[in-house]
């Protein structure tokens, strides 16, 4: 009898891509296994639609894509940000129940588990109805997972963790070797209006799962992974990464060709690439400071500059209609020979290009793994979510990045804090320093090799996945 796993990713492109690529990895490693991925649509993220179309156009044997019914965006638009994903999964529970019910009644296939994104862990209730074991996928790193469990434990002990916000406190967190400054704690865990109580409820449920699968690898986060394994109150941990989509997300192939063509004309390792994720946008005054810093640095650059969502709109904007309205006067003309400002960017293809020598990143976990895989030095500029913590981990804990900022917050930047052009200039020059003079570049190169060994036969992640199969099957 064939075995079937059901995957339920959260409907954001960074979460979805990781789980689909993981499904492909599972299938490639186990010939008797099939995977069904249930995809919920999210009105804000156009990347989900484009990626979904690419999956349907280029099907993978034994991988089934099931699109859950779309719901009216009006159901979510008036809700606070932290309440959107809970609402999404609530509207889909009936459909998920029907799908699991039908699959468990098959006489030719045995459903061996449900692998749910951590944000959708409450779907465990439905899996339990059909005696289907639930496994959790953590799209962020082991350090972040350990911090979340730690804060949830403090919360359970009646400590008000929201008091850490805007404090000078340093926390001793089991998954970090260094004290963690409160200023880099993810906003959603310490903001009274940020739904922290709901998030901690997810981590409580996570402790009830059969295992936690993390997109990381032993050599990158040894301290954090070991701390999670030492905690008897946390389910077994399986680091199986880096799991990456090295073929891109199916978006804008014509634009990608233009961008890569421009890079083809640049000298090796000469271009600094700036990209801040799907939701990474800046106010006009910060955009101007970045432009001045880039120009003064003297380095060639490729800058993915995206606008925020206009009031009343529901979808992410890929680019500005008129760059001259937001950039300093004459900037585009003065830098036309050395720089290119774009909207959407084919990030993986850019990081893989020989012309790129440095990456100014928002420090989303997928971006960190991609930078390691492609031996790309990073300068940290976190924006939202857990990215401040990721930046701290990269700079202080692992020594793999240059710090522009570790505590910049686009989501709650109500104070109008601005990173000035002179600091940006200095850090870009440090980032692009020649390899012989850069300890960080040497460490990144070593970690690249370790990442590839981890995924190869008998490597740490290869072995971890084999052990996971023993548990699941």
From Swiss-Prot:
Chain residues that bind UDP-alpha-D-glucose: 345, 347, 362, 365-367, 370, 386-387
EC main group: transferase
Pathway(s) where this gene product acts: Secondary metabolite biosynthesis; terpenoid biosynthesis
SUPFAM superfamilies cross-referenced by the UniProt entry: UDP-Glycosyltransferase/glycogen phosphorylase
Reaction catalysis annotation: (20S)-protopanaxadiol + UDP-alpha-D-glucose = (20S)-ginsenoside C-K + UDP + H(+)
GO terms assigned for molecular function: UDP-glucosyltransferase activity
Pfam families: UDPGT
GO annotation, biological process: terpenoid biosynthetic process
Function description: Component of the triterpene saponins (e.g. PPD-type ginsenosides or panaxosides) biosynthetic pathways. Glycosyltransferase that catalyzes the biosynthesis of compound K from protopanaxadiol (PPD).
Name of this chain's protein: UDP-glycosyltransferase 71A27
